[in-house]
């Protein structure tokens, strides 16, 4: 299958992306909805959830991506491989995130935000993915002990995400150092592999939902 070509950055504030994410009938996309669920926000081509689903058949994986062609391609790949613990959704996670998470199964255990679009300019801060409303929604959806993994190769972006989650009293860091040297999940994203090959640093942290 030919690789889908897409725009690198998409403005999440444009009218096209202002619809609330619609959750599927979970029983139709997963063969066992009781498995713990990992949500990967901004999954791009979905290679990370795909590899995780292959390596961890005892978990369900959900990728959310704002670029629809990538979601269509990713679901086609998952279907072709017969993975019953993997699904992708198209949409903007920051449109009424509480409503989106309220339709989740009660099995959410982990959320990851990895290498999001950086939106460097100060006036574009509202386009960044880790908005306060999303952080609150994640905190409300995760059970005690649930995890959040944050990664970026752009230090100001990583620091901004880190600060947003640190400001929420429902999260604590699992490590004493500012950044983790290694990916705690052991499965790199495509961007992470590229950074490794270029000897470019990656700034990552892992948080846990408090009781």
Swiss-Prot record:
GO MF: tRNA (guanine(46)-N7)-methyltransferase activity
Entry superkingdom: Bacteria
Pathway it works in: tRNA modification; N(7)-methylguanine-tRNA biosynthesis
Record carries keyword Cell membrane: no
GO terms (BP aspect): RNA (guanine-N7)-methylation; tRNA methylation
Cellular component, GO annotation: tRNA methyltransferase complex
Purpose of the protein: Catalyzes the formation of N(7)-methylguanine at position 46 (m7G46) in tRNA.
The protein's name: tRNA (guanine-N(7)-)-methyltransferase
Source species: Synechocystis sp. (strain ATCC 27184 / PCC 6803 / Kazusa)
